Amino acid sequence: MYSTKCTNFFLEIIFYVIFCTLFLLVLEKMSKLLSWIVIVCLFVFAISSKCSAQNYGINVPITGSMDVVLANSTQDQIGLTSTLCIYYPKAADTEIADPEWKATVTQLLLTKGWPTTSVYLNEYQDLVTFSNDPKLYCDYNIVLAHYTNDVALDISELAEFLLYEWLCNPMDVTLYYYQQTSEPNKWIAMGTNCTIKVCPLNTQTLGIGCQTTNTDTFEILTMSEKLAIIDVVDGVNHKVDYTVATCKINNCIRLNPRENVAIIQVGGPEVLDISENPMVIPKVSRMTRMNWKKWWQVFYTIVDYINTIITTMSKRSRSLDVSSYYYRV
């Protein structure tokens, strides 16, 4: 008979064999499970990255054997999410003489992707009136300015006025002297009749080439204008004189370009390129010219090229709820 020690030895061998077998089985199962988990994670990661991929090209053609150019299907339809204002002079409505012409224009713009509820045709009396109180409330604003010899300068200053944001404060010339401190610092005069006179002062507040007590000796900068952007020598105090009853003048700082505004000059020998004005920095390209024919032809052309015009602009991105001294024009 086997001894007790021998029996225990065999039992220990059987126990370790069973234990090792079970351990190997569990280890094999766990390794398979971990492998499956790793494989599934890699598969899900690879698939999700492809699904969320975005084609950032704009109207990029697909080259190869295809015969057509396919536009990017993710490109936004601007007209569906934006508002468009077109400002036109009263003379246009008078010439067209059709009570339904606005409806016709909006229906034509619908064919270009602009819903009738997103388009507003706003009339202004003349450039002078419009420049004194421009209301540019849409995401995209297009101003039609009819060129005539007597309003050439008005268009030029209106363009500079509208294509930039201005931070302005009213000037009290009866109490204070004023100076311009930098290139963006201008004085803007608006009203029915603005004649601006100035007398530059030295460090002792004595007039340079003029008498501070005699406005007849002041230098005349503007004469009977409705809108004037005034530039004087920086860093020099000036005594200013103007007719308060028919004009108001503000001390302004030119800020960022108003990229949601474009001006179309209708008629004239050539477009008034305000970017050539040394007062205008940086250069702008949102002003163009259209041949003058009839107002119906003007609006047909606007409709035909509306989306091309919009591409030169940027949608309004900031609120109009600002202080009364901040002219978002």
Swiss-Prot record:
InterPro entries on file: VP7, VP7_1, VP7_2
CNP motif: region residues: 168-170
Record's subcellular location: Virion; Host endoplasmic reticulum lumen
GO cellular component term, pick one: host cell endoplasmic reticulum lumen
Coiled-coil residue windows: none
Residues engaged in binding Ca(2+) 1: D98, G209, T217, E219
Similarity comment text for this entry: Belongs to the rotavirus VP7 family.
Record function comment: Calcium-binding protein that interacts with rotavirus cell receptors once the initial attachment by VP4 has been achieved. Rotavirus attachment and entry into the host cell probably involves multiple sequential contacts between the outer capsid proteins VP4 and VP7, and the cell receptors. Following entry into the host cell, low intracellular or intravesicular Ca(2+) concentration probably causes the calcium-stabilized VP7 trimers to dissociate from the virion. This step is probably necessary for the membrane-disrupting entry step and the release of VP4, which is locked onto the virion by VP7.
Protein name per the record: Outer capsid glycoprotein VP7
Species annotation: Rotavirus A (strain RVA/Chicken/Ireland/Ch2/1979/G7P[X]) (RV-A)
Native organism taxonomy: Viruses, Riboviria, Orthornavirae, Duplornaviricota, Resentoviricetes
